[in-house]
């Protein structure tokens, strides 16, 4: 880490070049926004290298190291989600709708027995198919069910568990006094995340050369 100091006069540490990450990432034919995906992939992989260097080399408090684990997992899951999203869109398997909300009508409150009720009616018009939101759980299920990637089925189950940790990006979500970040992220989660990410990035559908991801095995 000393080489990263602005006062350092020696050779600086640099992550793997952006161009190498871009060139190494394979995407399915028909993937939309390939340039943006490759760019964001490269930037976030560089960031993971930097986070991993901090975790490996810095002497930090238990709170700070825990927060680095959290950041690493959030970024890594984001990379996987982007690749799964791109794959489903390329394969024309992304969730679509042919209806668009036109208007909503609401009634006034009415008495019904001992309750106060109101009705709300949504009116839709039929349109050409368009993409709608698809959550990460749905992406994982679709990728697995269709067998789009050369991955063991156990990878998907493990990924779902890690996905729950990614949801802790929402700081207000908790289930009790002890349900906080410090109690939810640890070195095992971090190691687990690296292994899963390595498996996904080196599968033949995404990878030209697995050697570039060797740092994930450290």
Language-model features and meaning:
Residues 1-69:
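Charged alpha-helical initiation segments
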Residues 35-50, 80-89, 120-131:
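Short, contiguous, well-structured surface segments enriched in hydrophobic/aromatic residues
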Residues 66-92:
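Short, hydrophobic, well-ordered secondary-structure elements
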Residues 141, 145-218:
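Charge-enriched, short contiguous segments at helix-coil
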Residues 37-40, 44, 75-76, 155-158, ...:
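Amphipathic alpha-helix face/heptad-repeat signature
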Residues 53-60, 88, 92, 174-178:
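Short, flexible helix-adjacent loops and helix caps
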Residues 93-168, 176:
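Flexible secondary-structure boundary motifs
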Residues 44, 48-51, 55, 76-80, ...:
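Amphipathic alpha-helices that form helix-helix packing interfaces
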